[in-house]
């Protein structure tokens, strides 16, 4: 039986013709039956693809033949092509949408002026040496942090990466500008950019974790400074670094520990992802995001004895 895997990767390198790279990558993935999402810009490439393990290996080999991608690191994860609805390869102004394409500078070595890279062991060593002075700064959307984060991390109030510039310019975090700040995100790419944006705005000692949460979790599992589950952007929705993980998220209705995000049942104008335990999700009356309109719709379904999951 064939073994499937998911690849996560990115590279910051100048690309003079992103459209040509797009066409090449699409043809390569289609020839190998890979599915997933790839973004390309003049700053580089950002991708997550899944498929048969041998096809993934062939993809790595072929992609590294491109001069700008020859040192690109690939992270392996559980899953496969079935975790993605299709293959999407697009050209964008940014490979991560911070809304600052003209501010970001890259050369053949990566992002210019970004935070100092720390390997997972060096993160622990920094905390051991500097103690509570070290601040972990979450570079993801606030929703992702609901099910897992570094211990005592600062979690900015952002819904998308586009919100980060306004958030760090708000003054809320000015007291961190003279402290050692360790930015972190899923695989590292968001912090390549975020750390440079923070340095440009007066943060003096900024770090980023090589390989992000994924690499840290692979090395230390649940025995290090990471707590909970890792949110991922595919059908799995979350992953853990061993069976002994701690559930840090809580159901919005009954406060039961859970790491499961579910969609609000209001399909017409909501569908928000919220944390719900299995019991509250199974109950039509509580299968909502707690907004007044959505709660009323859920109550109406319950009163009529209708379950949208059964009738749809």
Curated annotation (Swiss-Prot):
Question: Which EC class, in a word?
Answer: oxidoreductase
Which residue numbers delimit the Rhodanese domain?
Answer: 130-225
Catalytic residues of the enzyme: 185 (cysteine persulfide intermediate)
Q: Which SUPFAM superfamilies match?
A: Rhodanese/Cell cycle control phosphatase
- Keyword Mitochondrion applies: no
Q: Which SMART domains does this UniProt record tie to the protein?
A: RHOD (SM00450)
Cite a single GO BP annotation.
tRNA modification
Q: Could you tell me the superkingdom of the organism this chain comes from? A: Bacteria
What's in the keyword line of the UniProt record? Answer: Oxidoreductase, tRNA processing
Entry EC no(s): 1.14.-.-
Reactions catalysed, as given in the entry: uridine(34) in tRNA + AH2 + O2 = 5-hydroxyuridine(34) in tRNA + A + H2O
Q: Per UniProt, what is one GO molecular function of this protein? A: oxidoreductase activity, acting on paired donors, with incorporation or reduction of molecular oxygen
Fetch the CDD domains from UniProt. RHOD_YceA
- By its UniProt entry, which PANTHER family does this protein fall under? THIOSULFATE SULFURTRANSFERASE/RHODANESE-LIKE DOMAIN-CONTAINING PROTEIN 2 (PTHR43268), THIOSULFATE SULFURTRANSFERASE_RHODANESE-LIKE DOMAIN-CONTAINING PROTEIN 2 (PTHR43268:SF6)
Q: What does this protein do?
A: Catalyzes oxygen-dependent 5-hydroxyuridine (ho5U) modification at position 34 in tRNAs.
The record's similarity note reads: Belongs to the TrhO family.
Question: What name goes with this protein?
Answer: tRNA uridine(34) hydroxylase
Q: Which organism is it from?
A: Corynebacterium glutamicum (strain ATCC 13032 / DSM 20300 / JCM 1318 / BCRC 11384 / CCUG 27702 / LMG 3730 / NBRC 12168 / NCIMB 10025 / NRRL B-2784 / 534)
Name of the gene encoding the protein in the UniProt record: trhO
């Amino acid at each position: 039986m064939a073994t499937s895997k998911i690849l996560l990767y990115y590279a910051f390198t100048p690309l003079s013709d992103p459209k040509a790279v797009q066409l090449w990558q699409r043809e390569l993935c289609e020839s190998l039956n890979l599915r997933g999402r790839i973004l390309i810009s003049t700053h580089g490439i950002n991708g997550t693809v899944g498929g048969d393990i041998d096809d993934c290996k062939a993809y790595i080999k072929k992609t590294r033949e491109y001069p700008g991608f020859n040192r690109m690191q690939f992270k392996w994860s559980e899953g496969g092509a079935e975790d993605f609805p299709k293959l999407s390869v697009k050209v964008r102004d940014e490979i991560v949408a911070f809304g600052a394409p003209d501010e970001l500078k890259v050369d053949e070595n990566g992002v210019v002026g970004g935070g100092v890279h720390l390997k997972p062991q060096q993160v622990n060593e920094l905390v051991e040496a500097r103690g509570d002075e070290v601040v972990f700064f979450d570079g993801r959307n606030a929703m992702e942090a609901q099910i897992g984060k570094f211990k005592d991390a600062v979690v900015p109030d952002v819904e998308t990466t586009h919100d980060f510039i306004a958030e760090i310019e708000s003054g809320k975090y000015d007291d961190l500008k003279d402290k050692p700040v360790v930015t972190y995100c899923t695989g590292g790419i968001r912090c390549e950019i975020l750390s440079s944006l923070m340095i440009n705005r007066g943060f003096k000692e900024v770090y980023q974790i090589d390989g992000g949460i994924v690499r840290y979790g692979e090395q230390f599992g649940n025995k290090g400074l990471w707590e909970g589950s890792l949110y991922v952007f595919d059908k799995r929705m979350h992953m853990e670094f061993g069976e002994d993980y701690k559930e840090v998220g809580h159901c919005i209705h009954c406060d039961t520990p859970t790491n499961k995000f579910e969609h609000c049942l209001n399909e017409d104008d909501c569908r928000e992802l919220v944390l719900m335990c299995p019991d509250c999700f199974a109950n039509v009356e509580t299968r909502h995001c707690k907004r007044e309109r959505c709660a009323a719709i859920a109550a109406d379904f319950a009163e009529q004895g209708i379950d949208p999951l059964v009738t749809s």
